[in-house]
Amino acid sequence: MNQYMEFYKLLGEFYNEEDITVDSPMSEHIYFRVGGPADILVTPVNEEQVVNTLKLCREYNVPYFILGNGSNILVKDGGISGVVIKFNKLNKITTEGNCVTAQSGALLKDVSKAALENNLRGFEFACGIPGSIGGAVFMNAGAYDGEMAHVIKSARVIDENCNIKNLTKEELELGYRSSIVMKKGYVVIEATVELESGEYASIKDKIDDLTNRRESKQPLEYPSAGSTFKRPEGYFAGKLIQDSGLKGFSIGGAAVSEKHSGFVINKGGATAKDVLDVIAHVQKTVKENFDVELHTEVRIIGRD
């Protein structure tokens, strides 16, 4: 049992037994399929539970981590201290006029589907991003010349004082893979995107096209966290890595993808250390060859 068992009992006062676990392996919750256990993992089913959990964590000085769909996360082999709050059960999506509103845990593919079903265009870029809308707002996720900054209208967040506030597009300060949510440690609980009216057939065609492009170019057959590195200004990370002769480079069960050099993948049986060692070698080699620093797009968290 871990050091947070007394805190676990406090949380148990407002969680059902199936919504709170101890020493939950993070490899079961993230796309990379690596990582040690979370001391406590909770899956809230309403906003009140989220607020109560955050208040307790802050009152007792217990660290916490917000988890969406786990698609852009690398958890170290030592696991995560404190509490992981997983939003997968907060996934309601509603549509009103040209706006789609989704709870933080709603998957981007499902928001994209809701937009399609209501003949709304502009969210097609997100159809293949394997994340939640909360995570997408957090990092201003994007693909294929689209990003959340292009469509976001507003978001409801929990601030550092556990107060719920509404932030406009401008107040969210969305930049390249960044936001005020990321900078200030806010927690997204709901987001609204504003789209344009379109024709079902043309929207569906674009979704199908982007899906085919993604499947043909990305190593979806292996666990990964998507694009491992941010795009350096004036360059493409994948090309720098490929031109450094690193395609297929591996350590343990982790490797640079043969299909797309911008992806570090879990070929099978990788540890988080394997992945981190591959990332470090890629960064060092690209720096030596091109004097360009590659920064990770994947979030690296946890204990060594």
Curated annotation (Swiss-Prot):
The keyword Flavoprotein applies. Disulfide bonds: none annotated. GO terms for biological process: cell division; cell wall organization; peptidoglycan biosynthetic process; regulation of cell shape. It catalyses: UDP-N-acetyl-alpha-D-muramate + NADP(+) = UDP-N-acetyl-3-O-(1-carboxyvinyl)-alpha-D-glucosamine + NADPH + H(+). GO terms for cellular component: cytosol. Cell wall formation. This is UDP-N-acetylenolpyruvoylglucosamine reductase.
